[in-house]
């Protein structure tokens, strides 16, 4: 089977790696163009780009697939199927119709729940008890195509964005191979649009004094490693935390261990990171902190 693989971030790496070891032929890899990164602003290739080059596979980095020249190039690869995993570009109808078996997508949620760009974060923020992977046929809608295969698992207490991301990436690659091995036997199941909800891209990682304690706790897990508080205009990331039901004045740092009183409970930071420093335990962090900072309100 001739496959075009379309993906960019680390989530897609497991799937590409498995395809490269399979009997199928990956004829081209489509990924986002390198972006300037770091202090030197050197172009940084996506994880998928790096693996494709190491495997001597042609890499394509179009800025859009809406142009006829790009569509003709795609057609000339003569794909039987296109596999999409967090690619980052919209696939127009002309592209969707080229492969014999269409374009199939690896989506890290139990569709139709959490269609959109940030399903893992929203799964955690909502307090969902389970999650999973949906292998779906792409159409012109937003993650609205029929489902080819779906598998779920329970979310564990200690799961955060990273652990769920890694579990879903592994499950997605395994499920993808099952679908491809039975591609002619698949019976697509139409999604129930009435059950759909959407996972918009997350851009605000701050924990606010007005947040309920459970919301703040979920933010720590959902936004790992980016959730933060601000004290005296300093940004402090909270990488791990717990919480308890006891609470006092909302938004206040209630003791020298930086326990944060919020609505409905107290957030208990366990691992934190000050801007420009390495992560450390809350105990080590407090030892190196000005005493005034642990008597303030978060901003």
Swiss-Prot record:
It comes from the Bacteria. It catalyses: L-methionyl-tRNA(fMet) + (6R)-10-formyltetrahydrofolate = N-formyl-L-methionyl-tRNA(fMet) + (6S)-5,6,7,8-tetrahydrofolate + H(+). (6S)-5,6,7,8-tetrahydrofolate binds at residues 109-112. The keyword Ribosomal protein does not apply. One of its GO terms (molecular function) is methionyl-tRNA formyltransferase activity. Pfam families: Formyl_trans_C, Formyl_trans_N. Its EC number is 2.1.2.9. It is an enzyme of class 2 (transferase). Keywords: Protein biosynthesis, Transferase. The keyword Transferase applies. One of its GO terms (cellular component) is cytosol. Attaches a formyl group to the free amino group of methionyl-tRNA(fMet). The formyl group appears to play a dual role in the initiator identity of N-formylmethionyl-tRNA by promoting its recognition by IF2 and preventing the misappropriation of this tRNA by the elongation apparatus. Belongs to the Fmt family. This is Methionyl-tRNA formyltransferase. It comes from Wolbachia sp. subsp. Drosophila simulans (strain wRi). The gene is fmt.
